């Protein structure tokens, strides 16, 4: 059995990762999905969260917005609206987004879209958590 699989993380404007890896953990909408070489074919909806993969015994982390994953023939393809490697997350920008979302949530006006503010807060917190890994 092959000891690695090919991981591609693709957003509309560029490919974030395209490499051989030994393990991938995806943030599925129904929970985390662990993918090893030889995994059966799979299509999965992804939630906003942390994608984790291993390469040469090193751990790597990527923030992804919601998207889809396809697993087939030792290849994992992730299609997402946005993705950032942990090392590329702008912590100041993520912190500012968190503060803006917090301010909107504290402002109890009817014209505030609470679901959007909560989603923005959730994204910012995940990005900040991933940036420290």
From Swiss-Prot:
Q: Which Pfam families match?
A: ATP-synt_DE, ATP-synt_DE_N
InterPro entries in the record, alphabetically?
ATP_F1_dsu/esu_C_sf, ATP_synth_F1_dsu/esu, ATP_synth_F1_dsu/esu_N, ATP_synth_F1_esu_C, ATPsynth_dsu/esu_N
Chief subcellular location equals membrane
The answer, when asked if Cell membrane is one of the entry's keywords, is yes
Q: Which GO terms describe its cellular component?
A: plasma membrane; proton-transporting ATP synthase complex
Q: How does it sit in the membrane?
A: Peripheral membrane protein
Function, please? Produces ATP from ADP in the presence of a proton gradient across the membrane.
Q: What is this protein called?
A: ATP synthase epsilon chain
Which organism encodes this protein? Lawsonia intracellularis (strain PHE/MN1-00)
Output the lineage of the source organism. Bacteria, Pseudomonadati, Thermodesulfobacteriota, Desulfovibrionia, Desulfovibrionales
Q: Which gene encodes it?
A: atpC
């Amino acid at each position: 059995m092959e000891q690695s699989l090919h991981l591609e993380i693709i957003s509309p404007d560029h490919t974030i990762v395209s490499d051989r890896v030994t393990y991938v953990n995806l943030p599925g909408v129904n929970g985390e999905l662990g993918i090893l070489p030889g995994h059966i074919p799979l299509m999965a909806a992804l939630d906003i969260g942390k994608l984790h993969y291993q390469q040469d015994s090193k751990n790597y982390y990527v923030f992804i917005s919601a998207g889809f994953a396809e697993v087939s023939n030792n290849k994992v393809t992730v299609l997402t609206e946005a993705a950032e490697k942990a090392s590329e997350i702008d912590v100041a920008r993520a912190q500012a987004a968190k503060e803006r979302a917090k301010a909107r949530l504290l402002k109890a006006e009817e014209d505030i879209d609470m679901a959007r503010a909560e989603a923005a807060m959730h994204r910012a917190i995940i990005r900040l958590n991933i940036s420290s890994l």
